[in-house]
């Protein structure tokens, strides 16, 4: 039994502070990204503003989580902060998959429109994310071990796996198109730079999915109860690294590979459109 007015278990008593620190880290990342947007007005795409919005949702989510756990720890109930936390968890979770999908599809970076198959993926991911967040809320508010809890846990796991798989398809298609374009036209060096960039981003996405869905689960299932915070910490570190790495790859600077190719392609827009099969 914990000494003093601490209603959290021993392994979770440090979580309020940890999430507050995580919120500060994401606040710093948001400040840096905002500065980049201000200083690089001539190199901006719409996706950069969506990435900014994603960072904002993530930052607010971290602070709401910290406040929720703080009040649970000191008063035994979240004083309504859990509702705000669930709202921004939904916004952040849904927006993260949408942004990954749009970056992977090359939307606003390679082309101004989504292809029909990419639109279909998007219409699948959004409802799945709504279902995933409903399951997450139920799991957070109900007693573990009941039949209903186990059912919603299985639904959450299945839906999460489907979303993770779905967002990879547009990225794979973009890599395939870039590879074919690099082999067929005379702009090999330009397209190879962009191809390598998307290949690296694919590796980062796969590594993040593997770590956050498998390694974190193994931590949670194997560490002693006094170290329950380790899985939460590893999840936050992985997410922070993923956000920072993604921002670095697609930052709005003149020497970024996708921007260099975009400027080059303005002289032959019709050829580029045919190469990528853009549909309105």
Language-model features: locations:
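Hydrophobic alpha-helical transmembrane segments corresponding to the first two to three helices
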Residues: 1-131
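Generic detector of multi-pass transmembrane helix bundles and their immediately adjacent loops
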Residues: 77-280
């Amino acid at each position: 039994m914990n000494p003093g007015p601490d209603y959290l278990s021993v392994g979770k008593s440090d979580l309020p502070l940890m999430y507050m620190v995580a919120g500060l880290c994401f606040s710093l990342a948001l400040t840096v990204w905002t500065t980049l947007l201000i200083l690089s007005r001539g190199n901006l795409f719409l996706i950069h503003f969506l990435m900014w919005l994603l960072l904002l949702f993530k930052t607010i989510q971290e602070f709401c989580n910290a406040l929720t756990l703080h009040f649970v720890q000191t008063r035994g109930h979240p004083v309504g902060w859990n509702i705000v936390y669930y709202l921004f968890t939904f916004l952040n979770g849904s927006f993260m998959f949408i942004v990954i999908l749009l970056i992977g599809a090359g939307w606003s970076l390679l082309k101004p429109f989504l292809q029909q198959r990419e639109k279909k993926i998007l219409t699948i991911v959004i409802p799945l994310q709504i279902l995933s967040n409903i399951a997450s809320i139920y799991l957070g508010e109900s007693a573990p071990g009941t039949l209903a809890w186990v059912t919603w846990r299985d639904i959450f796991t299945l839906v999460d796996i489907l979303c993770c798989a779905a967002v990879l398809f547009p990225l794979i298609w973009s890599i395939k198109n870039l590879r074919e374009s690099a082999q067929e036209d005379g702009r090999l060096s330009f397209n190879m730079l962009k191809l390598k960039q998307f290949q690296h981003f694919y590796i980062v996405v796969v590594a993040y999915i593997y770590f956050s869905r498998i390694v974190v689960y193994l931590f949670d299932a194997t560490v002693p109860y006094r170290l329950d915070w380790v899985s939460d910490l590893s999840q936050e570190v992985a997410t922070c690294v993923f956000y920072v790495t993604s921002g670095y790859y697609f930052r709005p600077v003149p020497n970024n590979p996708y921007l260099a190719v975009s400027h080059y392609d303005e002289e032959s827009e019709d050829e580029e459109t045919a190469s990528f099969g853009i549909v309105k």
